[in-house]
Each structure stands twice: as C-alpha cells, then as structure tokens.
C-alpha cells in the first residue's frame, strides 16, 4: 500500500500551477496563496453532501485551495454543489440510489483523478469511516484527510476499539467480547447479564443500527432492525452488545494527531442531549463535570490515541454514570458534526488543522501544543432539522417557501440546504443548519441560542425549532444536568408553542383566491366597492366631534353588571321611553347578506357604535345562524368575535339568540351541552339570552331558560308569533299566546320576548297582543322582535311601544326593510318627542349609517336581489331570515325560475305539517319539504298518498319523529306514520332520550387532534362537530383570516396593488401581488408571487380548473382510529400483513425507511386488516393511508 504523499515527496506540479494561474489569474486563491506557507497542494474534493462540504470549502478557500464537490442526481440543486469551484455528478442519472451515490468509492476516486484532485476529505457519515475508501484514495496517489486505513479499521470497529481500551487499562462497559451476527449470541449475553442492553452497529454511528432493549419481548425484533439498519447505512450488518447504563452523561473528547505520533486534546464536549442515540444539542465544555474526572477522561483519551499513533481529527467518547464513573465507548475516526462548539471555545479551526496535518504539518508547526490550548467561555450547538416533533420527529419533506436566518453577536451558522426554494426530499439527513452560539458563561450562551432559534423563520416544511426552544428552556437544561435519555424521560418537552406562520398561511389563502377566485359559498361576483370605507365623524349635542378612539363607558350594561339581572329588568321596566335593540350586527345582515358580515367590519365601527347607541337596550350580535356560519363560511371563531366585540363595546348589553334545547344547533342536544354552552357564552360576553323554541314547546324552552339562569345571564324567555291572531279561523289565537305566556312566566324570566320571525304581526294585532300581556303582567319587561318583510314593520313596532312594550327591534337604515328589521331612523323619528322616545341621538345614528351604506356595497356579492316589501308574506309566512336563503337554495337546486311555485309550495308544505310555528329549525323543515315537492312535481295530495314510498328530506323525518319537540295540536296523521314507516315516534322532549355528552373526553380529543383545547372549543364541537373540525383544518392551512380586509378576503387585488394587513397591534404586513405564474401541466399548479414587507415570496397553488390526473395517495383521517397512516415520508421496505389478517395491538404492519432511519408501523389496536394500500418499494408521504384495521 502506498504511503500518504507528503509535500516533500510530491511530484512536480509546476506545470499544473502555471496552467492554473493562467486560467485563474484574478481568483481569490491566487491572492490568498501568500498566507499559506505550509499548504503545497492545490485542489481538495469533499466526498459528502449538505453542510459539511460547505464548511470544509470555506476553510479550503482560506488555505488557497481549489474546491471540488460531488453530488448525486437528487442533489443537483443542493447548495454544496454551488459553493465549490467545480462540481461533478456521481455517475449517471439512475445509476445509483440517492444514498448509494455517496458510497460509490470507485466513482468518486475516478472523478478526483480525472480533475486533478490532491486531497480528499470524507466529512462525516457516508464513507468517512470506510477503510477501503481511505486505502483506495491513498493507493491512487492522493491524500486522505483523516486517519490511516489501518486506524479506521481498528478504531472504526467498536469491538476492536473496546479491546484496545482494555489493553490500555481504560474502563469499558460490560459487553460482548467481539462482534455478533446471530440472534442466539445476543440471547446468550442477556441470559448472563440481564436487561437493559444496547445493540450497536459495529461500523458507523449517528444512531443508525442502534437499539435499546429492555425485555425479552423486544429482543428479536430490535436485533433484526439494528442489523438491517447497519447493513443499509454502512454496508455491514455486524453489531455488538453492551450493558445499558441508566441516565448517564455522554462526554466526548476532541483529539488531533499528526504524522509524527503527537496527539493533543481540545477538551471535551457534553453530548448528553440525544434522541434515539442521535445528538440533538451539544455543549462545550461540559458544565458540571468534576475537574478530577475531566482530567482523567482527557488523559485516557490522549493515551488511547497515542497507542495507535492516531493521525488527524478524531473523537474519543465516554459515558459518565451518576456516580461520576466513566466508561470508554468508542473512538470516531472522523470529524464530528459538533466540532463547531470546540472551535468556538478554543479558537482553533479544526478543519484547517485536518487539512494541514494531511499535507504534512506537525502540531508544533500549527502552534497546537497542549500547553497552548485552552478554553474560553461556553458554546452550545443546535441542529435545526425538518422534523416534526409532534409526530415522533418524523422527517418532513417539501419546498422551503421562506428562509430567514438568525445572526448577531456570538451566533455562528453552518448551513446546508437551508434556503428559500430548496426542495427537502426524504433521501437524506433532515438537517438544514447548525446554530452555534458562544458566551462567556453557560447561561449567556443558552440565552443566545434561544434568541437565535426564535429569530429563524422557516416556512413550507415543519422544523424542530419549537422543540429546541422548549428543550433549552427546561429547568434541567438550564441547570446543565441533562442525561442521554433526558428527551425520552421528559414528556413536557413536547408541550410545544410553535411559530404561528401567519404571513405564509395568509399568502396561501391569497394565492388561492388569486388563482381560483373566492370559495366563499353563496358569493356571486366581486364586491362593488373598490375603495376604502370612509368612517363617520360623530358630533355631540353642541356640534363638537366626539373622541371615538376609546369606546363609551356608560350604558345599560353598567346597570346590569353592578346590580344584576333582576335589577336590570326592573330598570328597563321603569324606563319611560321605549328602548331599541339594534340587530345590525346579527339578524339584519343574516336577512339581507346571508349572514356573511365579518368580524373585522364590525370592529371597524364598534367604538362609534358604543357612543351612538349608548342608550340602546342591547346589540344583537351573536348566536343563531351567525355561530355556525362564522366557522362554516367565514372561517372565523365565533368566540373570538364575541371577545373582541365585547372589549370594543363595554357599555351596551350584548344579546344572543338561543334555540332552547338546541343551543345554537339545528336539533336537540343533551341538557349538559346546553348548560355548558350558556356558561361559556356568559363568561365570554353575552348578557341577554333570547331563548325560544321553534315549536313553542314549553318543555324544550324550559331547558334553555334554566341553563341561562344557571349561567347568571339575563333570561329573555321568548314566544314565537305565527299566523294571524285576528283571523278567527287561524290556529294561533290570543288565548293560545296568553296561555303560553302564563306557562313561561312560571320559569321566572327577567324579560318576555315576542319573536315575529316572518314579520306577520300586524299593527292592530300588536296592540292587542302586547296590550293584553301588559295588562296581565304589568311588571314584566316586554321586548318585541320583527321583520319588515311586508313593509309594515315600523307601524307594528310603534304600535307595540304604544301598547306597553319596553324595547323593540330595529336595524341601521341601510340594512333595514324587507326581510330585515324596520328602519331605526324611521322608528326614532316616529317616537321622538313622545313619551316613548328611545333616548338616542338621531344625528349620531344617521352618521353611523353612512358606514353601513358603504359596507353593503362591499358585501354586494351576497345580495338576494330583493327590491321591495312583499305583503305576500301574510300568506306564505316565510321567516325573514329564511327568505333570502331560500331564494339562494332554490337557485342552487335549479328552481330559480320556479320561485313563485316554491312560495306556494311552502304554504302547502306548512299545511301538510300541521301549520307549524316557522322559525329555525322548523322553518327549514317546511322549506326543505317545499323544494322537495317542487323538484319532484308533487302536490299535497301526492305527498300524503305516496308518503310510504317517498324518500323525504332528513329534516322532515327528524321533525316527524319528534326530534325537534312536540308541535301544538300534535303531528299530522296519516302523514307521520306513513313517512316514518319503522322509525320511532317520540312523545316527549328529545333531550330525555339523549345521553349526556362526555365533555372531558371531547376536550381531550380536541387537544389530541389540534394540540390545544379550550372550553369554548368544547362548546363549539358539541354544537357542530363536523363544522368545527373542518374549521380547525382550514385554520391549520390558512391561518386566522379574520384580520384580512374583506375586499381581499372576497377577491384578489390588482397586480401591483399594495395593501396592509394588521396581524396584531404593531405588526402590519405590507403586501403586493406581483405575478401569477403559468400552469404547470405536470402538477396542475401555478406559482403566485407576492411581495411581503419588501421581500418576494411565492406560494404554489392548485389550479382547480386544470385537469391533472390526481396520483396522490389518500390520507389517513385524524380521529378515525381504524385508519393507519405513514408516520413519515419514506420508502416501504417490508410488508408484514395482508388483507384479512387478524392483528393485535402493537403488531408490526410495515417497515419504512427514510433519511437512513427505519421505523416499524404498528397496529394501533387489535382487529382485522383491510384495504392494504401499499406494497414494498412504494414511496409514501407522512399520513398517507397504509391500511385500515377494523376492530375485532
């Protein structure tokens, strides 16, 4: 074997150097050459990838060396290729696997020889510990930057290293005397020494081929996995076995040796913070190692190296137990990932020393004698990887969309493929960058690392930054007392607070709108308003502008808060005027704009509202349809809306609509769900609960009333008005309503509500009904709600005020009339100066309306197209809130041209169902039946005659079954019996048949699926499980869109248009749409380019109009325990089951290999395998559906 070539033996390179200088006269290498007296070589190749070649290239350039990179086809866009002076692909495309390319010894040596390379540095991993590679490099006449091949063979084999330590009288952990290849040998060791043990690959490191086994049941599978991983990673499946030490520290010593037998140490590093035996965070020097133990470890490390004439850089590794006894593990004959922290505390460039030693320099020539080497301060290194800690550190793949590094004093970054646009594949190690920070003390260095981690911005792939931040902030790490299994032993480390990634998620939504248009259901076209809304200026009685920078602080809310619900009710009743409830924030936009007004637009006028309506009875702003629509269509949290509005309007009581035993859902729920919901609503800001039941079922109503009482809210027990009580032939007459009032009063409500949802309460009927109630209950406050569908709303509300009502409903003028509430301006003008004066400033109310006039144009895509009042409502009795939705639904069902027929069918459907009170959800039942009749061309007679064979809408069957309560006068027969066939018939309120919800379990499930859970989340889930889950998934993808101005929520900006998004106080994004790229026929995507705070970002968006074959695998659905998903991206290397096989919980299903790691996919529960969707060799992404396991 040829000896390593030394400078004095080198061939004459004059011709090469002359040619090189002719070609590169102006290169940096020529200018630097004078600074390198020792270096006589000209070109170095690094046989590696990622960050270590870049690290080596930088030092090589400082030493005036030309640099050569090699790369696999999969790495053709990697950064290390660009950082070298020359770069050559290993083999041809498809010739090698992604990892195999970097293990292709002959090919790499061939490239080096063809391109005049003098030195080859192996980096770490891959061929760095391969003696054959080192030997072939030197046999080819080049210099291997590392130990001799003989040293690699003797020390790289951990068994040989162990025998060496025993000869040198260095302590070792009890273990097998040599390598083992058979399971029986491992079994024999455990029979002698017991458990726990550790199985280690005899060649290589980095945690591959390493398994801790704690009992006999795990032994065989762990042995097979360790040998398989070792064979895949290092080409040799040999392993050895040791006794496993519990909670030791992992201390390693950095060594340097020259070609003349000289060896020095560069002190120690503490590498105890590990996961699966792979180092995560390293510290230099070790913080709490006793001085005498440190000195003995350092001396033994040097003794071991000298005993084998160690050359170049290496690391001696030790375990230190809790009694400070230390044991030699191995010597790694290569540079380590964590060499950076030693460089930071010693000031020594280890890579430069490596190269110069390889070139023949002595330690003395380099000034590296032991007496000259000392440490200063501390350094800590973190490895930032594309791993998802919340999913067992499964590697994430994809495109890095944003990459912003940390920096500043004491921060060193050694990067690899961390840059915007980089594609992270499953083929290689997941590390993006090493972040090393130094400080004069351990605590200063620790704080600096935490600051640097928080400063990083990496988007497009998951990273371990949240986990690292949690780790470095843990008290044990702060104390510096971690051990090797600290991460596994400390589950609280995984209570992560991740980066919100708000800007990039927002861009994903904006990009989708730019490519595909708005996806908001019900939107037709784009907003008519293109400019900004001009906010009104309010003036006081003296004509001076009001300061609306802060909200008003005096109103009926203060009476309620200070004196309680009973006193509040007495004060309302004692008030001489008729108060106003403004419905603009809920029912008005529900009736005219499909409930689509967003929180941001309510908040923009909230302070002005608190001043202008300071004397209002309440603001109706929550509950009813706004609750589910917020999540379903606006992608907002209704609780967040309530919290924000409450803060902005502290002086006016907030009123919500509560559907009795339904809560805000469309069907009955268990009683405990209603009580829980009301408690959360009261806590979050609701004051007055307008409780009603769609059928005026007193038993249903009682549940809601008692729940509000328990929550200590204001109970407004509400009776729904339907029909025409002046018509003696109608079902609902005055005695009916008075009897209802008598029953409701028994529940001790604070206020009585009358809910005229269709606007059919005529003025003369209003006088009779309100007057009769007032006469019977002179001390009970009365509040009347109506719609102006017939155009008589103002007259009816004035009649109510004159008859003794304490509060009536109205909406801002621009959102009033038709299916909405009567005009507030008209009511104020009618009552102004009378004994019923509401006490509001008409000028301020009118000023407020200028905002809503503009805003209605912004929401023009949701207009129903109504042009005026519809007195026909007295016939069909369609509720105002339903009428606009019914028009839209009819259009969607292709019945738009049959609207008149639909209205007549609504009357017929109502008669068929027994003339029910029509309000959500019973109004939906009537509407569904009406559309069903029109679609199927059915008459009322047809429905009755064919009821036994027709497939009725679900809502109709639920009503007939009794799931919505008991209607006045009973269910219609024979329709009910015929339609239900074999379904049950309930004769009591449905809640009595429902089991209480397990609210604690719901909270646990939410936390498990989404990382956090509040009681508000539980309440939302209880009302609308599927809607809540869809909303959470949407937010996970696109973030909180409630901060986005409505114009850009509904339509894309113009190219080059700049707009602002305020994420929170003091944090504003300045955005500009730059371009929309062409369609990629391969992916069906377009690239959308935005400027964000002056920085160009891009997002890839699926073009929904493109026809691209969808080859994506189905995903395992969260929450469905029968579906088994891939825990990470990778290749399926083994399938252990087949369809129909019975498995037990924990049985292996398949084995994945990714990023040089293997992972067994286990059965989550016992059952039978079905729908096995993968086979050996398949590539899968994280959460791809592998199979289903049907529970036994």
Curated annotation (Swiss-Prot):
Substrate binds at residues 586-590, 659, 920. Its main location: cytoplasm. CDD domains: biotinyl_domain, DRE_TIM_PC_TC_5S. Residues 1-23 are annotated as: Disordered. Its EC number is 6.4.1.1. ATP binds at residues 158, 242, 277. It is found in: Cytoplasm. Residues 578-846 form the Pyruvate carboxyltransferase domain. The modification N6-biotinyllysine is found at residue 1156. The modification N6-carboxylysine is found at residue 755. It catalyses: hydrogencarbonate + pyruvate + ATP = oxaloacetate + ADP + phosphate + H(+). Residues 1115-1190 form the Biotinyl-binding domain. GO terms for molecular function: ATP binding; metal ion binding; pyruvate carboxylase activity. The active site is at residue 334. Pyruvate carboxylase catalyzes a 2-step reaction, involving the ATP-dependent carboxylation of the covalently attached biotin in the first step and the transfer of the carboxyl group to pyruvate in the second. This is Pyruvate carboxylase. It comes from Aspergillus niger. The gene is pyc.
């Amino acid at each position: 074997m040829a000896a390593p070539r030394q400078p004095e033996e080198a061939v004459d390179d004059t011709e090469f150097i002359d040619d090189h200088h002719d070609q590169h006269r102006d290169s940096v290498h020529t200018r630097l050459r004078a600074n390198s007296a020792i270096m006589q070589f000209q070109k170095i190749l690094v046989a590696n990838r990622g960050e270590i070649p870049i690290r080596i290239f930088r030092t090589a350039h400082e030493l005036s060396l030309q640099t050569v990179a090699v790369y696999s086809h999969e790495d053709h866009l990697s950064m290390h290729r660009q950082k070298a002076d020359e770069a050559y692909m290993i083999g041809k495309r498809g010739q090698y696997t992604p990892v195999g390319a970097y293990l292709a010894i002959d090919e790499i040596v061939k490239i080096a020889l063809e391109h005049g390379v003098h030195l080859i540095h192996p980096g770490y991993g891959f061929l760095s510990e391969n003696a054959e590679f080192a030997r072939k490099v030197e046999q080819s006449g080049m210099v291997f930057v590392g130990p001799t091949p003989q040293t690699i063979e003797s020390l790289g084999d951990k068994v040989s290293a162990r025998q060496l330590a025993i000869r040198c009288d260095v302590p070792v952990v009890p273990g097998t005397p040599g390598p083992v290849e058979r399971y029986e040998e491992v079994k024999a060791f455990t029979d002698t020494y017991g458990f726990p043990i550790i199985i280690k690959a005899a060649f290589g490191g980095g945690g591959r081929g390493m398994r801790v086994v704690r009992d006999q049941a795990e032994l065989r599978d762990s042995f097979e996995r360790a040998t398989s991983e070792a064979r895949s990673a290092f080409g040799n499946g040999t392993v050895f076995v040791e006794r496993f030490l519990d909670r030791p520290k992992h201390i390693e010593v950095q060594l340097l040796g020259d070609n003349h037998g000289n060896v020095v140490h560069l002190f120690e590093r503490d590498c105890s913070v590990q996961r699966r035996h792979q180092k995560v965070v390293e510290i230099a020097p070790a913080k709490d190692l006793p001085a005498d133990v440190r000195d003995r470890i350092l001396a033994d490390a040097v003794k071991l190296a000298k005993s084998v004439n160690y050359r170049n850089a290496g690391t001696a590794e030790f375990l230190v137990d809790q009694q400070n006894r230390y044991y030699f593990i191995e010597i790694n004959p290569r540079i380590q990932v964590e060499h950076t922290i030693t460089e930071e505390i010693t000031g020594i460039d280890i890579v430069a020393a490596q190269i110069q030693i390889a070139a023949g320099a002595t330690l003395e020539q380099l000034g590296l004698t032991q007496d000259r080497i000392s440490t200063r301060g501390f350094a800590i290194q973190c490895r930032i990887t594309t791993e998802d800690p919340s999913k067992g550190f499964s590697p994430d793949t994809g495109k890095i969309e944003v990459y912003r590094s940390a920096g500043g004093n004491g921060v060193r970054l050694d990067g690899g493929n961390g840059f915007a646009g980089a594609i992270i594949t499953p083929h290689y190690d997941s590390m993006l960058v090493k972040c090393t920070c130094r400080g004069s003390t351990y605590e200063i260095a620790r704080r600096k690392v935490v600051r640097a981690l928080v400063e990083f911005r990496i988007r497009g792939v998951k990273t371990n930054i949240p986990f690292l931040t949690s780790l470095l902030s843990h008290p044990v790490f702060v104390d510096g007392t971690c051990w090797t299994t600290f991460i596994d032993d400390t589950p609280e480390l995984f209570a992560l607070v991740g980066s919100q990634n708000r800007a990039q998620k927002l861009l994903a939504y904006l990009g989708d709108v730019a490519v595909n248009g708005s996806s908001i259901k019900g939107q037709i076209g784009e907003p008519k308003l293109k400019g900004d809304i001009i906010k009104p200026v309010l003036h006081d009685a003296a004509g001076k502008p009001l300061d609306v920078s802060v909200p008003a602080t005096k109103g009926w809310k203060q009476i309620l808060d200070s004196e309680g619900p009973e006193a509040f009710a007495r004060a309302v009743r004692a008030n001489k005027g008729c108060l106003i409830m403004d419905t603009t924030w809920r029912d008005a936009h529900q009736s005219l704009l499909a409930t689509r007004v967003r929180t941001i637009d309510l908040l923009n006028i909230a302070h002005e509202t608190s001043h202008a309506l300071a004397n209002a009875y309440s603001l109706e702003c929550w509950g009813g349809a706004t609750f589910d629509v917020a999540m379903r269509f606006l992608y907002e949290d209704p609780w967040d809306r309530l919290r924000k509005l409450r803060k902005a309007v502290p002086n006016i009581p907030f009123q919500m609509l509560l559907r009795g035993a339904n809560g805000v859902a469309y069907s009955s729920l268990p009683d405990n769900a209603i009580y829980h919901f009301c408690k959360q609503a009261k806590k979050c800001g609701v004051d007055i609960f307008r409780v009603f039941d769609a059928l005026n079922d007193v038993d249903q109503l009682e549940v809601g009333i008692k729940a509000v009482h328990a929550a200590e809210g204001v109970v407004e027990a509400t009776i729904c008005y339907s029909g025409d009580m002046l018509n003696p032939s109608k079902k609902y007459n005055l005695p009916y309503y008075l009897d209802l009032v008598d029953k409701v009063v028994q529940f001790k409500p604070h206020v009585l509500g009358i809910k005229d949802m269709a606007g059919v309460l005529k003025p003369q009927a209003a006088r009779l009904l309100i007057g009769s109630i007032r006469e019977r209950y002179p001390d009970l406050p009365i509040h009347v709600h109506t719609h102006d569908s017939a155009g008589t709303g103002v007259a009816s509300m004035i009649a109510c005020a004159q008859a003794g009502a304490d509060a009536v409903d109205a909406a801002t003028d621009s959102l009033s009339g038709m299916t909405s509430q009567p005009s507030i301006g008209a009511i104020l003008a009618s009552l102004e100066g009378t004994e019923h004066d509401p006490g509001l400033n008409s000028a301020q109310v009118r000023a407020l309306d200028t905002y809503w006039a503009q805003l209605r144009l912004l929401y023009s895509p949701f207009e129903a197209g109504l042009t005026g009042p519809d007195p026909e409502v007295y016939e069909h009795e369609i509720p105002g809130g339903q009428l606009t939705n019914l028009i839209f639904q009819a259009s969607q069902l292709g019945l738009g041209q049959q609207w008149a027929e639909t209205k007549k069918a609504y009357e017929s459907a109502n008669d068929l169902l027994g003339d029910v009170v029509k309000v959500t959800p019973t109004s939906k039942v009537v509407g569904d039946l009406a559309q069903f009749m029109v679609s199927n061309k059915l008459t009322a007679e047809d429905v009755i005659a064919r009821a036994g064979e027709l497939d009725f809408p679900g809502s109709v069957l639920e009503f007939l079954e009794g799931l919505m309560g008991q209607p006045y006068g009973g269910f219609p027969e024979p329709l009910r019996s015929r339609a239900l066939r074999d379904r049950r018939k309930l004769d009591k309120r449905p809640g009595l048949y429902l089991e209480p919800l397990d609210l604690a379990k719901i909270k646990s499930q939410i936390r498990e699926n989404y990382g956090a859970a509040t009681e508000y989340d539980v309440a939302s889930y209880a009302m609308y499980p599927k809607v809540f889950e869809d909303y959470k998934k949407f937010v996970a993808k696109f973030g909180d869109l409630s901060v986005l101005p409505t114009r850009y929520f509904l339509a894309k900006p113009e190219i080059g248009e700049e707009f602002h998004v305020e994420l929170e106080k003091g944090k504003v994004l300045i955005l500009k749409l730059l371009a929309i790229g062409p369609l990629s026929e391969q992916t069906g995507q377009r690239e959308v380019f935005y400027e964000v705070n002056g920085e160009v970002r891009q997002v890839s968006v699926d073009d929904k109009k493109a026809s691209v074959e969808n080859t994506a695998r189905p995903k395992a659905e969260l929450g469905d325990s029968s579906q088994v998903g891939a825990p990470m991206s990778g290749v399926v290397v083994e399938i252990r089951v087949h369809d129909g096989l019975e498995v037990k919980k924990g049985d292996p299903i398949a084995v994945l290999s990714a990023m040089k790691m293997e992972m067994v996919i286990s059965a989550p529960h016992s059952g039978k395998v079905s729908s096995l969707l993968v086979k050996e060799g398949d590539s899968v992404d994280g959460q791809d559906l592998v199979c289903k396991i049907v529970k036994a």
